[in-house]
């Protein structure tokens, strides 16, 4: 929970903003929405989606979720906005607030960008901040896991890939550990962040995990020339990708996850993206329902 603009307001900026009870409540609400559509009249509420980084799934599923909730979605394109004239993020958001926008969904390349928005008087949903956090992705991942297993206690989860630059890894580690799962990481040495937890050898644990979560290599965040120089698709797939050989070692009942976009034959063999154990496209489907639940939650908590 956050204090912004000098008064109490409920935002969703980090997984730390949610209690375990709130996480489970959101999961159950999203599953309800998945089973049956509801259309409450909210024609008087306006939402703007500000995406300063490229996005397909997060942006479009928020848009669909907003329209399913009968919200008025205001089109905002960074490329045609006054951001191109040097306007600050705060001034852009304050302008939208002053013309009647009721809430914002924001993705930005800067970690914790929302700290500069403390004087806003409308709620913010974080659509991803740099390599910081991605709460809505984490919540849809939690929903997908709960839908499969009905629990978190005792689950063994590995997150594999570019951990150092991944907001998904950070959000999932925080929330899933709190919910009772064991989360460990697999990564090339150059993309490790030891502060997040334990790193293990992929081949030592592949046959013991319940969930194998694969991450995209985040080329756009690689500023070190060594990172770029050492990366090879073939070598990465051989050492850190889910190959067909590793897939065969997964135990019965194990599932594969990936926040997408997927680099086929890099993080995962092309033939496995829609395999029996894969939940990758189901995650995308669940994303829209979870984002509906998040929007409802923010509307209700802020009495909009």
From Swiss-Prot:
Binding site for L-aspartate: 85, 167, 216
GO terms of molecular function: amino acid binding; aspartate carbamoyltransferase activity
SUPFAM superfamilies: Aspartate/ornithine carbamoyltransferase
Any single GO BP term: 'de novo' UMP biosynthetic process
Catalysis: reaction(s): carbamoyl phosphate + L-aspartate = N-carbamoyl-L-aspartate + phosphate + H(+)
Transmembrane segments: none
Pfam families reported for this sequence: OTCace, OTCace_N
Any coiled-coil regions, as ranges: none
Protein's UniProt name: Aspartate carbamoyltransferase catalytic subunit
Lineage: Bacteria, Fusobacteriati, Fusobacteriota, Fusobacteriia, Fusobacteriales
